[in-house]
Design a protein with these regions (language model features):
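N-terminal acidic, proline/glycine-rich, low-complexity intrinsically disordered segments
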Residues: 1-17
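N-terminal signal-anchor transmembrane alpha-helix
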Residues: 21-73
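Short juxtamembrane and helix-loop transition motifs at transmembrane-helix boundaries
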Residues: 50-55, 78-89, 109-114, 172
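Membrane-water interface at the C-terminal end of transmembrane alpha helices
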Residues: 52-62, 155-175
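Transmembrane alpha-helical segments of multi-pass membrane transport proteins and ion-pumping complexes
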Residues: 61-70, 98-106, 131, 158-163
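Interfacial helix-start motif at the membrane-water boundary
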Residues: 87-100
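Internal alpha-helical transmembrane segments of multi-pass membrane proteins
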Residues: 106-127
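Membrane-helix boundary connector in multi-pass membrane proteins
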Residues: 132-149
Length: 175
């Protein structure tokens, strides 16, 4: 017959296993809904292609931003000289955001059996979150026309980055 201390330890370890099993079961359904399964049947993009796509995403996003600023100032002349339209202002934020997205793509290809599906939805969610500061500066009284251009810039960055990454650094089939 086991001593009382042994019985308490056995019950404690059984309880811990049960709790961990309950947590695992609770996380399995949400993970399955977003295809976060850690069992992809494909190979990750080639590292060189990811690097190329990263450079192209940064360049394409900065170019899109610059063009949108030019269009925005042409459409709304009162926005000329707007502080957030300076390359030094939007450029560093664009580069940081694009680099984060470019780092996320190979990670998602490793943890998801449907990385394009998950990356697309992640890009939408992140873009919506990144619009919040724009709404805040609009609330603070920044010019509506200028803030609208900033919002379009966010959308352009998301479109450029997503498309460049999934096309220039696609997942590879299994061997």
């Amino acid at each position: 017959m086991p001593r009382s201390n042994e019985r308490i330890q056995d019950e404690s370890s059984t309880s811990t296993r049960r709790d961990a099993g309950g947590l695992r079961a609770a996380l399995e359904r949400p993970a399955a809904l977003i295809h976060l399964d850690f069992a992809p049947k494909h190979r990750q993009p080639h590292a060189g292609r990811v690097l190329l796509a990263t450079l192209a995403s940064v360049a394409g996003s900065l170019a899109a931003d610059a063009v949108l600023v030019i269009i925005g100032v042409a459409l709304f002349p009162a926005t000329k000289g707007y502080v957030h339209f300076r390359f030094s202002d939007y450029g560093k934020l664009t580069v940081i955001g694009v680099l984060i997205a470019c780092a996320a793509w190979p990670i998602l290809t490793r943890v998801s059996s449907m990385p394009r599906w998950l990356f697309f939805r992640s890009a939408i969610l992140v873009t919506l979150v990144l619009l919040l500061p724009d709404f805040y500066i609009l609330y603070l009284g920044q010019p509506t026309d200028a803030v609208a251009v900033l919002m379009v810039m966010h959308l352009a960055i998301a479109v450029v980055t997503y498309n460049v990454l999934v096309r220039l650094a696609p997942i590879r089939p299994t061997r």
